[in-house]
Amino acid sequence: MPTDYPNPNQTPTSNVLTVSALNQAVSRMLERSFPLTWIAGEISNFTRAASGHWYFTLKDDAAQVRAVMFRGRAQYTDFMPREGDRVEVRALVTLYAPRGDYQLSVEAIRRAGVGNLYEAFLQLKEKLATEGLFDPARKRPLPLFARTIGIVTSPQAAALRDILTTLQRRAPHVRAILYPTPVQGEGAANKIAQAIATASARAECDVLLVCRGGGSIEDLWSFNHEIVARTIVGCDIPVIVGVGHETDFTIADFAADVRAPTPTAAAELAATPRTEWLARLQTEADDMRRALKRQLSDTAQTLDWLSRRLISPSATIAHKQMKLQNLQARLGHATRIPLGKAQFALAHLRNRWLTQLPDTRIQRARVAEHARRLSNQMKTRSATQEQRLRALSAQLEMLNPQRTLERGYAIVSDEKGHIVRAPQELRPRQNVTVRLAEGSAQIGIASVQQTLE
């Protein structure tokens, strides 16, 4: 009786798959059909292997699937999953060939709802940045030497102990004021803002620390509220925010004048060690000494240069005497030449008169006129030269050292007769001679003082 069923013995061998080939084909199909995907569920059967890999089951009310997260990915997770945690995983759907089971190969894991929180974080950050709350030009510099530091945190927080320990170590002279507030939980954001506003209103401190230790994103969420950011920006005191660990960033960090990676780092930024104070003061003092020395050196050089240009009174008198002698010689020469010329002209006219007797009266008149002119010229020239001579004599008299002494000045000379011109040439208990207008005196030096201008 014929049948429509194929005969198994007649199926070509080339169309038969091995189990391994089947699993490989299914694995490729799964990977192509399901790229990296976010999947939400509850963790159960969590195991952390000695190799560092994580094995767990991800389930919901109706189904479950096995998952693995290898050590290379697990080490970057900021929390350790626990039984019953609600999480979201980013994973590839793969097939574990040895057992033929499909599973999730997890690339990243986060607590459930973190995605929504992160979106809210980005939206608020963009809004406040657009308003200019994060503008670097708005941020205030920290005081160079803070005497009082305010702390906004929980009295029970480990961060407070870290801050106080750091302040005691670095700057025990600094006064610390605590503005207590819850740092997580319902209503914490409003209370944090109130504590910051209180510190600003009291104006008791030079800088304000807003801090808490590390935790999950939910634990730190109070510092991502808009009211906290706006209160920080409106605070009249420079604010340092140190929340969580170095990798944690909150809205408060962006609003602060300075962001510190940890509470301890915030305390270090706020408190300048006393040794650093002293070092800075020493540096400033050294700079002032060097500047003063340079100024004194420049003044001394200028004084030395001016002293070399200054001519002594005796040299000035000698120079004026030589000039006076020169003028006297020129005056005598100037009077002799016109007189000789006049005498020559007179003799010439006399000869002409003698040869021309009929014109004697005319010649006499000419001679008289020439004589008159000659006399006037000689008187004018002589008066001018005498006036210059009197002026030079008056100048010479003004430079006479005796006249200077008569005006109340004195000339001081040492034991060797050298004139003393500067205080540096004198020493206490030295005997000197003081020359006055009408005599001299021997005196002893009690002390020497210099006048700096």
Swiss-Prot record:
EC id: 3.1.11.6
One GO-annotated biological process of the protein: DNA catabolic process
Cysteines engaged in disulfide bonds, as pairs: none
UniProt keyword annotation of Nuclease present: yes
Compartment(s) where it occurs, according to its Swiss-Prot or TrEMBL record: Cytoplasm
GO molecular function: exodeoxyribonuclease VII activity; nucleic acid binding
GO cellular component: cytoplasm; exodeoxyribonuclease VII complex
Domain of life of the native organism: Bacteria
Major localization class: cytoplasm
Cytoplasm among keywords: yes
Keywords: Cytoplasm, Exonuclease, Hydrolase, Nuclease
Catalytic activity of the protein: Exonucleolytic cleavage in either 5'- to 3'- or 3'- to 5'-direction to yield nucleoside 5'-phosphates
InterPro entries according to UniProt: Exonuc_VII_L (IPR003753), Exonuc_VII_lsu_C (IPR020579), OB-fold_nuc-bd_dom (IPR025824)
Subunit structure: Heterooligomer composed of large and small subunits.
NCBIfam families: xseA
Family: Belongs to the XseA family.
Function of the molecule: Bidirectionally degrades single-stranded DNA into large acid-insoluble oligonucleotides, which are then degraded further into small acid-soluble oligonucleotides.
Full protein name: Exodeoxyribonuclease 7 large subunit
Organism: Herminiimonas arsenicoxydans
Gene name linked to the record: xseA
